[in-house]
Amino acid sequence: MNKADRYSIGIALSGGGFRGMAHIGVLRALEQHAMKPDLIAGTSAGSLVGALYASGKSATDIESLASKIFWPKLLGSHALADFCRDNLPCTFAELAIPLCVVVTALPSKQPVVFDSGELVPAIIASCAMPWLFRRVKIGDSIYTDGGWACVLPARVCRERGCKKVISSDVWWRASVAKRSGFSTNGRFANYAYSRQYMEALNKSDVVINPQIHAAGMLPGRRGMRSLIRSGELAANETLRHP
C-alpha cells in the first residue's frame, strides 16, 4: 500500500505562538464533523498541539490539560521539555496518528521534517522561537523554530500523499501576506518567507482562519478559552460552507 492510499485527510497546523491554542478548537470542530485526520503536520505551536492530538488525546482532553498550565512558564526550553515528557510518548512510533514535525535547519534555514525517532526533541526544536529558546541540537545538526522555513506545513501533507488537506492557519502575519502576495514592499523579512506561505495556501483544499480578538492575544486561561472558541467557530463555519 502506498502513502497515497494510506492518507485520506491531512491536517496542517501553523505556527503562531500562543495563538496556536486556536488549533484545539479547530480539532474539536473536526471531531464534531466526524473528520478524523489520517496524518497531522505541525509547525512550532502547531507541532505541540498536533503531537498532543496525535498521541490519542481528544480536543477536550487537550483543553483540560492546557487550562492547568501557567503558560508563561513554558517560555523556556527546559519547562517545555518537562511538559512534553510528562504528556507525550517518547517516540513518533508510539503515536496513534502519524505526525510530521517541521523544524528549520541552521545555517541553511531550510525546512526539515521529522516523522520518526525521538519525539520530544523535534517538538522543542520546532517551537524554539529565537528570542525565547536556545537552538536545539539533534544528532550532528542544529535546528530552530520551524516557522522560519515553513509556517504552514500543507505541502508536507500533500507530499505524504494526503487526498484532502485541511489547514488551520493562525499565523499572525497571514492577513498581510494575503494582501501583499509576493511583494517585497517591506512588510516581510524577505520574498521567500511570503512565497512559502502563499504556496502553502495553494496546497490546501480547506483553509480555516480563526478570527483572533484582543482577549486571545494574552497568555492565560481567559485568552486560551477565547482562542479555542475562535478556532471552533471558524472551523464549523468553514466546514459548513467549504
Segments from the language model and where they lie:
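Patatin-like phospholipase
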Residues: M1-T43, A51-P242
